[in-house]
Amino acid sequence: MNNLFPFLALDKIALQLGPLAIHWYAIFIVGGAALAVWLACKEAPKRNIKVDDIIDFVLFAFPLGIVGARLYYVIFQWSYYSQHPSQIIAIWDGGGAIYGSLIAGAIVLFVFSYYRMIHPLDLLDITIPGVFLAQAMGRWGNFVNQEAYGKIVSNLDWLPPFIRNQMFIEGHYRMPTFLFESIGTLSGFILVMVFRHRIKGLKRGDIFSSYLVWYGAVRFIVEGMRTDSLMLGPARVSQWLSVLLVILGIILFVYRRIKKN
């Protein structure tokens, strides 16, 4: 219990409406997605993309992104879920992987772009600022669920009490790696929003490539601090994927500059 700020004492459930429990995790995920859609709808006309196309894309991408995030997590935690199959669908308790959501979202985006005859890089550039913001918000869902934390530390006196108390896990204070990633992705969002219309010579796909490099670097660093990483043998899966993102981002950025129009 937080004695200084009792109203900030955290529970996974934000609101109980009879048998319906509304979890903080869901609020942060849905809230981040809603802001991402709003941002994309504001930008779409500048790329000659219909707002209806953005809405239709989200109606496919959001639920499948949640499925992808959960499926990715379950696959790499199969030793547990094979023994507790009823927990596979318990997404309200947390246990989703951003990379799974990104993979599912990317598949939906390319298929959707093909059928709607929209250049995929245009759709990516439009949606990336919102993705940054949604990821920054989503990490606070992990915070409430006491996920995405780091190694044991002696104290967290530099943090506000409500964060410090929530980072007291299994009898020890834990490094708030969720916070580091949230700040990193929020910084990426701010940079993109400030500079995307101010830098001359930006090419189609540059915002997307900047996301790949920025988020890949942020996630690689933060993942190295975590103690609850998804593993494949001795390897941290997310760090390998982060390296891949950075490489792909650099390749795309260079390719767009050497490609003849």
Swiss-Prot record:
GO terms for biological process: lipoprotein biosynthetic process. Its main location: membrane. It is an enzyme of class 2 (transferase). Its EC number is 2.5.1.145. It comes from the Bacteria. InterPro entries: Lgt. GO terms for molecular function: phosphatidylglycerol-prolipoprotein diacylglyceryl transferase activity. The keyword Zinc-finger does not apply. It is a multi-pass membrane protein. GO terms for cellular component: plasma membrane. It is found in: Cell membrane. The chain crosses the membrane at residues 20-40, 54-74, 88-108, 175-195, 235-255. Pfam families: LGT (PF01790). A 1,2-diacyl-sn-glycero-3-phospho-(1'-sn-glycerol) binds at residue 139. Pathway: Protein modification; lipoprotein biosynthesis (diacylglyceryl transfer). Keywords: Cell membrane, Membrane, Transferase, Transmembrane, Transmembrane helix. Belongs to the Lgt family. PANTHER family: PHOSPHATIDYLGLYCEROL--PROLIPOPROTEIN DIACYLGLYCERYL TRANSFERASE, PROLIPOPROTEIN DIACYLGLYCERYL TRANSFERASE. Catalyzes the transfer of the diacylglyceryl group from phosphatidylglycerol to the sulfhydryl group of the N-terminal cysteine of a prolipoprotein, the first step in the formation of mature lipoproteins. This is Phosphatidylglycerol--prolipoprotein diacylglyceryl transferase.
